[in-house]
């Protein structure tokens, strides 16, 4: 999912770009945690870091057991000042957060906090409580998946404790459990409200965020034979479209061919061949070959429908 292209850039590339742009300190090293060895994924991550002249390393979470467990897979990098960002989120914020605390947790007000980890603050923004996906509404400040720690070893020790003692929340090892324990031991965390948040955690939120980014960036519209393009849309280089209606809210990756189709509110990745399709609220991977009429689909890489 983090390597899905949104208006021409992968989610992970956008995250790296935003951190580089908005941080007052130079990012010297990025550690990526992925589920399994994958040459294609690792190559893409390497290219992104090389573009920004950042060193990187890759760690593997072969057996997903929650957010804290994932972070601990890169425990040897948890030293000194550490910024942790979950790769299913984009944001607009600076990183000039207060440095007089042991850590900062980035938050955004949401309508439905039950889908997120949340924090409860005092009047000075100091965090009083961390709760993972609360069943009752104790706060509408959702944790957006960005955390700063002044010393990463504090987090490593806290996660090691919950792993050793098998302290699971909702069946998984959660970072909120580690944070709550750290707070109870006297460490102080501040909440830091971000300006904008684009959530990519589910297909629905991914498409909603895709729509917002297209509207914000307003890409230049290209013209094609017998085709109507309704903005906002992003169409990459090498795309061929004929006899189709595209948009609004569509991204099309490079070298994709589309004929006799109607596509809206949809992400189409690169090197696809699509004929006679009617797509709405859909996500198509790379190298998809499609020649059939479905209305609401999520298709992975190299799929064929004829």
Stretches with model-predicted labels:
Residues 3, 119-121, 191:
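A structural signal for short hydrophobic beta-strand segments in well-ordered beta-sheet cores
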Residues 29-36, 107, 267, 283:
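Short internal beta-strands
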Residues 2, 55-57, 126, 188-190:
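Conserved beta-strand segments of alpha/beta enzyme cores
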Residues 90-162:
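Conserved core of the sugar-phosphate nucleotidyltransferase
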Residues 162-306:
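Left-handed beta-helix
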Residues 87:
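Short acidic donor-binding/metal-coordinating loop in glycosyltransferase active sites
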């Amino acid at each position: 999912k983090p390597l899905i292209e949104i208006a021409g850039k992968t989610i992970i590339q956008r995250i790296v770009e935003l951190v580089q742009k908005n941080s007052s300190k130079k990012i010297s090293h990025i550690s990526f945690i992925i589920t399994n060895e994958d040459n294609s994924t690792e190559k893409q991550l390497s290219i992104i870091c090389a573009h920004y002249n950042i060193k990187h390393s890759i760690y593997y979470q072969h057996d997903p057991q929650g957010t804290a467990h994932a972070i601990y897979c890169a425990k040897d990098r948890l030293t000194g000042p550490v910024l942790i960002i979950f790769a299913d989120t984009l944001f607009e914020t600076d990183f000039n957060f207060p440095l007089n605390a042991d850590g900062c947790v980035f938050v955004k007000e949401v309508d439905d906090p039950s889908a997120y980890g949340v924090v409860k603050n005092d009047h000075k923004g100091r965090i009083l409580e961390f709760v993972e996906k609360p069943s009752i509404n104790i706060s509408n400040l959702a944790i957006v998946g960005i955390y700063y720690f002044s010393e990463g070893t504090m987090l490593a020790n806290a996660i090691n404790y919950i792993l050793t003692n098998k302290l699971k929340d909702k069946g998984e090892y959660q970072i909120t459990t580690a944070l709550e324990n750290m707070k109870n031991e006297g460490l102080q965390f501040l909440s830091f409200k971000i300006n904008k948040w684009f959530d990519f955690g589910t297909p629905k939120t991914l498409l909603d965020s895709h729509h917002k980014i297209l509207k914000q960036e307003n890409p230049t519209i290209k013209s094609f034979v017998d085709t109507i393009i309704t903005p906002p849309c992003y169409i990459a280089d090498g795309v061929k479209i004929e006899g189709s209606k595209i948009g609004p809210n569509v991204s099309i990756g490079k070298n994709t061919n589309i004929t006799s189709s109607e596509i809206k509110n949809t992400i189409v990745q690169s090197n696809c061949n699509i004929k006679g399709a009617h797509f709405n609220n859909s996500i198509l991977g790379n190298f998809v070959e499609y020649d059939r009429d479905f209305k609401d689909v999520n298709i992975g890489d190299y799929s064929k429908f004829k």
